[in-house]
Amino acid sequence: MNRRRAYEDDGDFYGERNKKRRRVSENQEMEERLETLILRVGENSTSSLESNLEGLVSVLESDLGNFRSKILRILSDCPIKMPEKCTIYSTMVGLMNAKNYNFGGEFVEYMVKTFKDSLKQCQWDAARYALRFLADLVNCHVISTNSLLQLLDSMVDAANEDNVPQVRRDWYVFAVLSTLPWVGRELYEKKESALENLLVRIEVFLNKRTKKHHNALRVWSVDAPHPQEEYLDCLWAQIRKLRQDNWTEKHIPRPYLAFDSVLCEALQHNIPVIHPPPHQDSFEYPMPWVVYRMFDYTDCPPGPILPGAHSIERFLIEEHLHSIIEMHRWERKDCAIHLLMLPYKDKIPLEYCIVEVIFAELFHMPTPRYLEICYGSILIELCKQQPSKMPQVLAQATEILFMRIDSMNTSCFDRFVNWFSYHLSNFQFRWSWDDWDSCLLLENEHPRPKFIQEVLLKCLRFSYHDRFKEMMPEGYAKLIPKPPVPHYKYSMEGAASLPGTATAHKLVVAIRQKCNAEDVLNELNDLPNSRDASDTDMAEAPFNPLKIDVFVQTLLNLGSKSFSHSFAAISKFHAVFKALAETEEAQICILHNMFELWVDHQQMMVVIVDKLLKVQIVECSAVATWVFSKEMVGEFTKMYLWEILHLTIKKMNQHVTKLSREMNEAKEKLARTVESSSSESEDEAASPNAQKRRKNTEGSGEKPTEEQVERMEEKLEAAYVDQKRLFLIIFQRFIMILSEHLVKCDTDGRDYDTDWYRWTIGRLQQVFMMHHEQVQKYSSTLESLLFTSDLDPHILDVFHQFTALRA
């Protein structure tokens, strides 16, 4: 057989196939080119924006026949993913609508579908940006004012529904108000009475609205020098100011004004009637927030004036900066460059606006949007990008924060400490400490000296102790941390009189000679049990505190060289830990001995507790009980102790989430298995290869049985019980110590509002805020068991503020 001949005969076939490949490749290249052109319109260019828009519209119009769906999709995605370019894309759509009315109608339908889908999928930012874009299309004569007003009215109707969460109602009003800066002037000129009616309805809603959540979200407990306004109240004040100015603002670029003569001739489309999807229990809405203010015009140097707190320009600038952070947060250098290149940067004190917005994100309650280190790294990059201005503005901001720290929220205090210590570590720990020496006259529990002490403790994690002794002024000696060394009591003066010293020394020799877990237990067996002398609950808590004391202190001291040495020691003698820590009381004893050894090394305690939890030597409930134990009273206002408690809660939350995910995946696999089995049994007679196909598909993954799924459900249920118990322990201990303090102060006739009280009530609030998603599940249980009506109002109010967040 002539192989060459066969290939020659097939030449036409292969040639045709290659042509098809080339066509597909050409189409793909063209689509990518169109996408790039649309995405980059309005960016740096030698020609004007108007000429770029005209040229791009001509290109898109000529390609509509081949790439219609692609163009529709890109044009509807862009204003949502790049909201700062909203008016550029609305102008583009307006010009295309003027040339091709049918395309304009298709686009409006597509955009309305995008808006409705965003609402159904609880993509609230996307929905708000889609609404804004639809509103801006009114300015470009694509959509009629009547149909937009009808849509805005239906949004306000949704805000007035009964028996729905307030956070849902709030969002619908916020979406309408935040759209008005773009379209307010057009509505004012053409439908003034309808616009006024809309605003009256919103005002009535706002006047009836409760704001129990407000205090929980404040950065400071006082309003001087800047009021801390709830977000809807602030935006409403800004909209009212905009109305007073006849809806004229100076920030939004409006390229469509250059094409007014073309756009005004275009036919308009009507938005179909849109009914917002009804509330469902599975829907999660954005939580309320407080608008953060750090600067006003008096803080800025001569030059461009900072817009007032109630000017709409302040809202627009801040939203633009927040949007840049959201878009570029993964690349700190790009983020810093884009922040510094904000349009209209010459008309505002840009550095002050940027710093205020970044701290607003960092101090956002209940938790920041992104990791705290994200904001710290962006601020460092800003200082590098603009060394002549940014470091000075940041130093001024730090000074303002320090001077107002007395009334700062406890969670924000922690974040301020974390940020400042991280920032100092990147700038050789240089700071003008002498400017703050007035705080040395205050009590150690006062927030100012406490802040400096906590900052130095955090800085110690980035450096070494001797450096701080040399660096800090002499007056700060009492705030400098002690050297982070272990205190091994069996090698201290007077250790010979301790009952476990001889065994401890033997244990040191044995461990250094590479003994195993069984050898260690044999060494410990000779130690007497002080609990044998009494019959107190021996059946319930059969553990020997002296064994734990000798073993834990000796082992951790031998592993004290580094974190890795400590981890290796814990891993090697894991079996000994498990044998000694069979009860919660024994686990608390382990933690107490770790604390005795490492009392001056907070970071070591944090990582060791984390390790003990990870390898399941101690339970989460034991850590919580230890944190609130009498032995830890002296540590109660120190940050590291709450770092330990929060990592413990997070460990429990992650465990529950993991089990829940695994169970849901197993249920889905089981359901698919049952479904495929039934369909295969039906097809088996018709298809002789069905059994073979089934064997092939069965090998693709392990399928759970019903018994396995039931066991997983039981494990998840047990995890939920443990999680609920953990929160009950924590909140019960808070209530006990706070109630005791309040009663004692009342009895003694003293003011209850001490530094200790403010730290403790702040920590209670912090637990609610940091873990709000998990605590929310048990709010009814907490209300019925702990936060009852007879509780002191000061404590109860914290709980009510928390429940109001999602009310």
Curated annotation (Swiss-Prot):
Pfam families: MIF4G, MIF4G_like, MIF4G_like_2. Residues 31-243 form the MIF4G domain. The keyword Nucleus applies. GO terms for molecular function: mRNA binding; RNA cap binding. One of its GO terms (cellular component) is nucleus. Component of the nuclear cap-binding complex (CBC), a heterodimer composed of Cbp80 and Cbp20 that interacts with m7GpppG-capped RNA. PANTHER family: CAP BINDING PROTEIN (PTHR12412), NUCLEAR CAP-BINDING PROTEIN SUBUNIT 1 (PTHR12412:SF2). Belongs to the NCBP1 family. This is Nuclear cap-binding protein subunit 1. It comes from Anopheles gambiae.
